[in-house]
């Protein structure tokens, strides 16, 4: 009898705690606010108008479709000219934020490095004044905002702000904190690309367009639960955004980036969607790319193949193919299957290619989607090399960077094993490599210290294995010991 009474009291206490939590949430609901900054006109750098302002509009339109409803979406599409002006704008936008709120900040601008300290910078400019923003200054300004902060950086080298996208001892994560969620358009050594139409009235960044379209079309919602997490958005960008490599912190975050009602129609803007490759890997012998996509409304379509040469995407010399249905006027709505063949490359018949779908409606042309293809060698030893740190503390938000070098493009499997040789986590499984702007062929992976179930791995010793198969031959390399805990 006493045991039953004890259980009953425990259940009642749990119910009261749940009711108290719900009442507290009702009294202090989560409020979302956003500040969107786009810098187009510069004093000492190339102007990028109208791309940044168009990105700000695109982001604002996307956030306005989030069913959680933002209390404020402040757009600074004409830029911000100084760090002090940015601080004041943040204070005004997020003045009422409390510990229960979410504050989103988006930047589209130039990203570069200080020539003396080699620290990453964002360029603030309104066309009249200009000042560089360091990672520490940005962190300091955001620390003054209560609650959870979501930072989206759309700039060259933006991964450097979270220490990702390069193997460099000088890189550090300036936003390592439970208060921050960060998504960047590129790695620490990569350009982040913009596009503009011929008339100069349309444009934007590849990253912002893919992010907004992936959210609004719901293609990034892999489990179709009506919520797109940061981890899902990151995965979606890896698949749909090939010109640079998006980075995120935390690496596998369940933080909700976007929410929608599954019972309502999507709000996708593009005339083309659901682009699917039969395979993202081609070879020296198989040089024909097969893909399919859905036409949402009548449109003319052109395909461009952009080749990666000497560490650069050759946007200036695309291989252009007109869709055969253009001859009859336009592609009609429905599912389409297409194929294109790569140009023969005698000097180096392997590397990376970007497939771009360009849609034209009347006089308006727009980038309607892109996919990255790795052209891999049929034979040869990839000469795998692996590097990683000796220890890290995931309980403090630290992540382990894993560098895997390889002589040529290949598909990698990266596995974390414990001291008994058991698999703890797969960081990659037959994942095609991609260009990172590192100067030599290499891939980077990040372990957040969690196992396959999403739980923090126990303190102890681990190793990282990287492997790939070329011409039926398996190649394997193993790291030194990595320790979690003291």
What are these regions (language model features)?
Residues 9-18:
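Bacterial N-terminal signal peptides
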Residues 21-279, 284, 297:
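Cysteine endopeptidase catalytic domains of the caspase/legumain-like
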Residues 100, 298, 335, 348-354, ...:
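Extracellular Ig-like/FN3 beta-sandwich strand-entry sites
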Residues 309-310, 417-423, 462:
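Short, glycine-anchored, charge-dense loop/turn motifs used at functional sites
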Residues 313-348, 423-457:
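Glycine-centered tight-turn motifs at strand-turn-strand junctions
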Residues 355-403, 459-486:
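C-terminal tail/sorting-segment detector
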């Amino acid at each position: 009898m006493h045991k039953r009474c004890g259980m009953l009291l425990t259940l009642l206490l749990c119910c009261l705690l749940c009711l108290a939590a719900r009442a507290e949430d009702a009294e202090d609901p989560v409020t979302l606010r956003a500040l969107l900054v786009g810098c187009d006109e510069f004093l000492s750098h190339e102007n990028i108008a109208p791309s940044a302002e168009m990105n700000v509009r695109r982001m604002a339109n996307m956030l306005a479709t989030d069913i959680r409803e933002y209390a404020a979406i402040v757009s600074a599409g004409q830029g911000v000219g100084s760090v002090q002006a940015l601080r004041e704008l943040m204070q005004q936008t997020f003045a009422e934020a409390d510990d229960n709120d979410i504050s989103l900040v988006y930047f589209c601008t130039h990203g570069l490095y200080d020539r003396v300290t080699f620290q990453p910078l964002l360029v603030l400019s309104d066309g009249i004044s200009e000042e560089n923003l360091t990672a520490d200054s940005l962190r300091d300004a955001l620390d003054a905002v209560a609650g959870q902060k979501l930072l989206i950086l759309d700039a060259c080298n933006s991964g450097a702000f979270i220490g990702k996208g390069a193997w460099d001892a000088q890189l550090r994560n300036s936003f390592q904190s439970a208060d921050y969620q960060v998504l960047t358009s590129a790695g620490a050594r990569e350009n982040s690309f913009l596009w503009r139409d011929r008339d100069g009235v349309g444009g934007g960044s590849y990253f912002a367009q893919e992010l907004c379209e992936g959210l609004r079309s719901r293609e990034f919602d892999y489990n179709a639960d009506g919520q797109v997490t940061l981890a899902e958005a990151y995965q979606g960008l890896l698949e749909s955004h090939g010109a640079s490599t998006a980075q995120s912190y935390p690496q596998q975050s369940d933080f909700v980036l976007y929410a929608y009602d599954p019972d309502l129609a999507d709000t996708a803007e593009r005339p083309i969607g659901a682009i699917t490759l039969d395979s993202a890997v081609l070879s020296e012998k198989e040089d024909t790319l097969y893909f399919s996509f859905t036409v949402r409304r009548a449109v003319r379509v052109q395909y461009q193949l952009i080749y990666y040469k000497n560490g650069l995407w050759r946007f200036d010399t695309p291989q252009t193919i007109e869709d055969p249905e253009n001859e009859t006027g336009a592609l009609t709505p429905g599912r389409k299957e297409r194929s294109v063949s790569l140009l023969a490359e005698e000097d180096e018949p392997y590397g990376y290619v970007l497939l771009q779908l360009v849609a034209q409606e009347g006089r308006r042309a727009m980038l309607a989607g892109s996919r990255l293809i790795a052209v891999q060698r049929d034979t040869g030893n990839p000469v795998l090399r692996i590097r990683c740190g000796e220890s890290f503390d995931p309980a403090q938000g630290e992540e382990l960077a894993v560098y895997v070098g390889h002589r040529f493009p290949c598909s990698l499997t990266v596995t974390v094993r414990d001291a008994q040789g058991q698999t703890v986590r797969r960081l990659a499984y037959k994942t095609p490599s991609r260009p990172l702007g590192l100067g030599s062929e290499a891939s980077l992976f990040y372990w957040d210290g969690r196992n396959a179930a999403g739980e923090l791995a126990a303190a102890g010793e681990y190793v990282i294995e990287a492997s790939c198969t070329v011409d039926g031959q398996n190649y394997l390399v193993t790291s030194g010991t990595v320790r979690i805990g003291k």
